[in-house]
Amino acid sequence: MRWLLDTNVLIDAFAGRSDTVRAITGARTATLEWIGYSAATRLEVLGFPGLTAADELGLRNLLAQFSEAPIDAAVIERAIEIRKSVRIKIPDALVAATALIYEAHLVTRNTVDFKNIHGIFVLDPATM
């Protein structure tokens, strides 16, 4: 199994939200083939206005524990297909497309944003 971590999950893990930390810690000790995040997620996490230098360093250290999935032509084309069929913001379309291309379960608290995307499997850390 593969997991793609959404922005809110990484932010929650950094903030120490217990259900998210428990889910990620459990996943890292399980037999997951891959745990990563989209390059769009890195932009969202680190591009936050007012981020302190200490928080940026902490977030970069957190991101370094996982693989980054690039936004390549295949991801962009899949995101275009998604946006043609579902009303969704561009970053979420890129994340969803990445999950589909990588055949990964999308781990997110924003399950509603992804519910109408065909073929995506969404996991909420609060219910794991």
Regions from the language model: what does each represent?
Residues 1, 96, 100-128:
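Acidic, PIN/NYN-like endoribonuclease modules and their adjacent C-terminal/linker elements
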Residues 84, 88, 104:
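Short glycine/serine/threonine/alanine-rich loop segments
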Residues 62-64, 117-118:
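Short, structured coil segments at secondary-structure junctions
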Residues 9-10, 41, 75, 94-95, ...:
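Alpha-helix capping/helix-boundary segments
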Residues 6-7, 45, 79, 99, ...:
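Generic structural signal for small/hydrophobic residues in well-ordered secondary structure
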Residues 64-85:
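Acidic catalytic patch
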Residues 1-37, 47-61, 128:
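Short, well-structured N-terminal submotif of metal-dependent ribonuclease cores
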